[in-house]
C-alpha cells in the first residue's frame, strides 16, 4: 500500500465538519499564507522542531546526525532542511524532548485502524472523517487509496481544501467526498497573491466546477486582519459566492494558535503580536453576507 506523510491525527474534532470526527492532517501545501496556523504543514517533508526552553545544550543531537544537518550556533540549534533525511535519530537521542518531528510516514492500514476506533461516536453524532492539511489533496495517489479503504466502512468523508489544485486532479478527487470544506480567502487575485503567494483564478474555477457538479460544499473564509477583514472585502467575497450560486458560508476569525510553532521552526511570523479576532468583532462583516442572502455563521 502507498504510504502517506501525516503530521497529526486529531480525534474528537468538532470544527471540521458535522458531528464528532477524526481529522487526518496531511503534509504539504502549495500556499504560503502569511497567517498560517500550521506552518509545519507547508513542507512535503519531515521536519524537526527545536524547543529552546527544553534544550540543555548537550549537543547529542549534533553528534547523532549522520547527515550533518544539525548545527549549534550562538547557543541555538539549527536544522538544515535540505540536508535532513528525516531519519529521526536526533529526536530519539534527545533525552530532554527538545527536538520533535512534524511528519511521519504512515501505512493506510494503520490510519484506518485509528479512524475506526471512534466509529460509534461518528454514528451517534452524524460525524465521520475529515482529511486536512496543509492541503488535503497534496498527496493524490495516497489519498485515493485511503478514501477507498475508508469507504468500505461507510464513513462520512469530508476534506479541507485550498482549491489550489490542478484541474485534472481536483476533478478526480473532489467527487470522492461527501463534503468539501473549501477555503475562500479573497475575491481579488492580486490581494490573494499578496497574502498567500498564489493567484486565485484556479481556486475559483475549481469552486465553480464543484458547485455545478452538485457536490456538497461549505465555503469557509478565514477572516484575517489587514488582508480581508474590511467591510469592502466582505461585500466582495459575498458577491463572489452568490454569483457562483452558493447559499452558505462559514467565517473563521483569525487566531494566534500557531505563533509558538514559528519560534520552534526559526521562521519569521508576519502576524506576530497581531490581536486575534472574536465573533463580536465581525458583526458588521457577517451582515454583509446576510444582506446578500447567504446563511453566514461561525
Regions found by a protein language model. Give the residues of each.
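Hydrophobic packing within well-folded, soluble alpha/beta domains
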Residues: 33, 55, 65, 70, ...
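Iron-sulfur cluster-binding cysteine motifs and their immediate structural context
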Residues: 34-41, 60-79, 89-105
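Auxiliary Fe-S-binding modules of radical SAM enzymes
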Residues: 1-18, 218, 223-298
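Fold-independent oxyanion-binding glycine-rich loops
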Residues: 9, 27, 39, 81-82, ...
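Conserved AdoMet/S-adenosylmethionine-binding subsite of the radical SAM
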Residues: 109-258, 263
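N-terminal pre-triad scaffold of radical SAM enzymes
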Residues: 7-60, 77-86
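Extended, non-globular alpha-helical segments
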Residues: 50-56, 103-110, 118
Amino acid at each position: 500500500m502507498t504510504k502517506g506523510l501525516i503530521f497529526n491525527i486529531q480525534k474528537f474534532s468538532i470544527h471540521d465538519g458535522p458531528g464528532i470526527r477524526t481529522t487526518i492532517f496531511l503534509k504539504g501545501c502549495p500556499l504560503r499564507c502569511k497567517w498560517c496556523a500550521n506552518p509545519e504543514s507547508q513542507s512535503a517533508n519531515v521536519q524537526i522542531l527545536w524547543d529552546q526552553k527544553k534544550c540543555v545544550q548537550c549537543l547529542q543531537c549534533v553528534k547523532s546526525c549522520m547527515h550533518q544537518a544539525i548545527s549549534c550556533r550562538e547557543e541555538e540549534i539549527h536544522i538544515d532542511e535540505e540536508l535532513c533525511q528525516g531519519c529521526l535519530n536526533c529526536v530519539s537521542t534527545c533525552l530532554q524532548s527538545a527536538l520533535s518531528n512534524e511528519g511521519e510516514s504512515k501505512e493506510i492500514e494503520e490510519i484506518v485502524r485509528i479512524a475506526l476506533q471512534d466509529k460509534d461516536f461518528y454514528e451517534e453524532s452524524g460525524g465521520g472523517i475529515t482529511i486536512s492539511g496543509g492541503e488535503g489533496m497534496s498527496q493524490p495517489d495516497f489519498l485515493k487509496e485511503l478514501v477507498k479503504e475508508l469507504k468500505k466502512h461507510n464513513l462520512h468523508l469530508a476534506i479541507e481544501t485550498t482549491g489550489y489544485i490542478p484541474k485534472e486532479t481536483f476533478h478526480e478527487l473532489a467527487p470522492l467526498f461527501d463534503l468539501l470544506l473549501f477555503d475562500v480567502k479573497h475575491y481579488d487575485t492580486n490581494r490573494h497573491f499578496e497574502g498567500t503567494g498564489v493567484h486565485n483564478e484556479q481556486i475559483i474555477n475549481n469552486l465553480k466546477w464543484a458547485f455545478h457538479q452538485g457536490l456538497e460544499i461549505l465555503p469557509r473564509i478565514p477572516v484575517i486582519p489587514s488582508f480581508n477583514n474590511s467591510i469592502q472585502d466582505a461585500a466582495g467575497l459575498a458577491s463572489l459566492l452568490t454569483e457562483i450560486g452558493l447559499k452558505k458560508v462559514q467565517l473563521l476569525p483569525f487566531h494566534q494558535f500557531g505563533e509558538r510553532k514559528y519560534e520552534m521552526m526559526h521562521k519569521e511570523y508576519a502576524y506576530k503580536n497581531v490581536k486575534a479576532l472574536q465573533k463580536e468583532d465581525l458583526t458588521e462583516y457577517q451582515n454583509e453576507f446576510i444582506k446578500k442572502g447567504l446563511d453566514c455563521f461561525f
